[in-house]
C-alpha cells in the first residue's frame, strides 16, 4: 500500500499511528474530514492479520462516518480508531494509554464504543480524556435508536420499491442478532413480518426464535433465501462477488457497516440484479445521532425525532439514483459531498466578508 497516495485518494486530512512500549499499544486514528465539525468515530479492538488491514479498516470506516454525519445533518466530521490487539489481552493500562492519545488531539477526534469495546472500557478511556461518548448510563446505549433507524430505512425502501407502506406478510432475513439485530427483529415482528434469522452464536438465534417466532437458518444459508428483504446486521464486507449471485431479496437494508466489499463493483452488481440497496452509512446513522446528542446534552425525544429523518433521506437518495441513473451508493455519496461542499463554500464566503 502506498500510504500517502491511499490517504490522498480517500480524502483524509490526518492519520495518526499511535505507539507505546509501556504498555504495549499499536493504534491507528484516522480523521477523514472536519468540514462540518469535529471527527466522530468509535474505537474497535481487533487482532488484524497485518497493519495494512488495520489501516484499510480505519480509512474506510472514517470516510463512512463523514458521509454518515453529512447525510444525517449532524454537525460532525468522520473519524475512526482501531487498536491492533487481541481483545483477550485488553487491560486498563492499554485503554488509558489509548485515551491519552485521543486527548492529545484536543477534541479534533471524539470517540466511543465499537467492536470489543464495552461501556466499562469507555469509562476507563474517559479517565484520560473527556473526548469520549456513548457511555450507557447517559443515553441507554445506541442499539434501540440504531435499530429504529434501520427499521425506518426498511420502510422507506419498501415504499420506493413497491409504493407501499405496509410490511405485514413480507419475508425478511436478518443476519446477525446482536443488540441492534435483535431490536430490529422486535420492530419487524410487531409489524407481522415473517422472520428468518442467522447468527454464529446459536444461543442468540434460539432466543430470537423464542421471542419472535423466527425461523433459524445456518449462517451460510441466509444469502440464498427467497425473501423480500435482506438485513445484514453483523460484520462488513458480506456483499461481495461470492455472495451477491446467491441473493434473491429485492431489498438490502441492514445495520452492518461497510457491507459492500468493493463499493463501486458490488453496488453495480446489486443494481444489475435489480436489488435496491440502502446505503449502510445512511440507514445505520441512529448510533451517531445518539452519541452526538449525548455530547451536546442528551434529550431522548430530540434524538428519536432526528432518527426519523433517515426515512426521508433514503427516499431522497433513491430518487436521486433513479433521476441520475446511478447506484444508490453513488447517490448517497453525492448527497453527502454536496452538503460538505456547500459548508465549505459558506465558510469561504464568511472569511471573505
From Swiss-Prot:
> What GO annotations for molecular function exist for this entry?
nucleotide binding; tryptophan dehydrogenase activity
Give the NCBIfam families listed for this entry: Trp_DH_ScyB
Q: Which residues hold NAD(+)?
A: 44, 114, 146, 176-181, 204, 255-257
One biological process GO term for this chain? Answer: amino acid metabolic process
Output the InterPro entries linked to this UniProt entry: Aminoacid_DH-like_N_sf (IPR046346), Glu/Leu/Phe/Val/Trp_DH (IPR006095), Glu/Leu/Phe/Val/Trp_DH_C (IPR006096), Glu/Leu/Phe/Val/Trp_DH_dimer (IPR006097), Glu/Leu/Phe/Val_DH_AS (IPR033524), Glu/Phe/Leu/Val/Trp_DH_bac/arc (IPR016211), NAD(P)-bd_dom_sf (IPR036291)
Q: Tell me what this protein is called.
A: L-tryptophan dehydrogenase
What top-tier enzyme class does this entry carry?
Answer: oxidoreductase
- Catalytic positions are 80
Q: Gene3D superfamilies given for it?
A: Leucine Dehydrogenase, chain A, domain 1 (3.40.50.10860), NAD(P)-binding Rossmann-like Domain (3.40.50.720)
Assigned EC number:
1.4.1.19
Query: What is known about regulation of its activity?
Result: Highly susceptible to inhibition by indole-3-pyruvate. Activity is not affected by the presence of metal ions, EDTA, KCl or DMSO.
User: How does the activity vary with pH?
Assistant: Optimum pH is around 11.0 for oxidative deamination. Optimum pH is 7.5 for reductive amination. Retains more than 80% of its activity after incubation for 30 minutes at pH 5.0-11.5.
Amino acid at each position: 500500500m502506498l500510504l500517502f497516495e491511499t490517504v490522498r485518494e480517500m480524502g483524509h486530512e490526518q492519520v495518526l499511528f499511535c505507539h507505546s512500549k509501556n504498555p504495549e499499544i499499536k493504534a491507528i486514528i484516522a480523521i477523514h474530514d472536519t468540514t462540518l465539525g469535529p471527527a466522530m468515530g468509535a474505537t474497535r479492538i481487533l487482532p488484524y492479520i497485518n497493519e495494512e488491514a488495520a489501516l484499510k479498516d480505519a480509512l474506510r470506516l472514517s470516510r463512512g462516518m463523514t458521509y454518515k454525519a453529512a447525510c444525517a445533518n449532524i454537525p460532525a466530521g468522520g473519524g475512526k480508531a482501531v487498536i491492533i490487539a487481541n481483545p483477550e489481552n485488553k487491560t486498563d493500562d492499554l485503554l488509558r494509554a489509548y485515551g491519552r492519545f485521543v486527548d492529545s488531539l484536543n477534541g479534533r477526534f471524539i470517540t466511543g464504543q465499537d467492536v470489543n469495546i464495552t461501556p466499562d472500557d469507555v469509562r476507563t478511556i474517559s479517565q484520560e480524556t473527556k473526548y469520549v461518548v456513548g457511555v450507557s448510563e447517559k443515553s441507554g446505549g445506541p442499539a434501540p435508536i440504531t435499530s429504529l433507524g434501520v427499521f425506518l430505512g426498511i420502510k422507506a425502501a419498501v415504499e420506493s420499491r413497491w409504493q407501499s407502506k405496509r410490511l405485514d406478510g413480507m419475508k425478511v432475513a436478518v443476519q446477525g442478532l446482536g443488540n441492534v439485530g435483535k431490536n430490529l427483529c422486535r420492530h419487524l415482528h410487531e409489524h407481522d413480518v415473517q422472520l428468518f434469522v442467522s447468527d454464529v452464536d446459536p444461543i442468540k438465534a434460539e432466543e430470537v426464535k423464542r421471542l419472535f417466532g423466527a425461523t433459524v437458518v445456518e449462517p451460510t444459508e441466509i444469502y440464498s433465501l427467497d425473501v423480500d428483504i435482506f438485513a445484514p446486521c453483523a460484520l462488513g464486507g458480506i456483499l461481495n462477488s461470492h455472495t451477491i449471485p446467491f441473493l434473491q431479496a429485492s431489498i438490502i437494508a441492514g445495520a452492518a457497516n461497510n457491507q459492500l466489499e468493493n463499493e463501486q463493483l458490488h453496488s453495480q452488481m446489486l443494481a444489475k440484479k435489480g436489488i435496491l440497496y440502502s446505503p449502510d452509512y445512511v440507514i445505520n446513522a441512529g448510533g451517531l445521532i445518539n452519541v452526538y446528542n449525548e455530547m451536546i446534552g442528551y434529550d431522548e425525544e430530540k434524538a428519536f425525532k432526528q432518527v426519523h429523518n433517515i426515512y426521508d433521506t433514503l427516499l431522497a437518495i433513491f430518487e436521486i439514483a433513479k433521476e441520475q441513473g446511478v447506484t444508490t451508493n453513488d447517490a448517497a455519496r453525492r448527497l453527502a459531498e454536496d452538503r460538505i461542499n456547500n459548508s465549505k463554500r459558506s465558510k469561504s464566503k464568511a472569511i471573505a466578508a
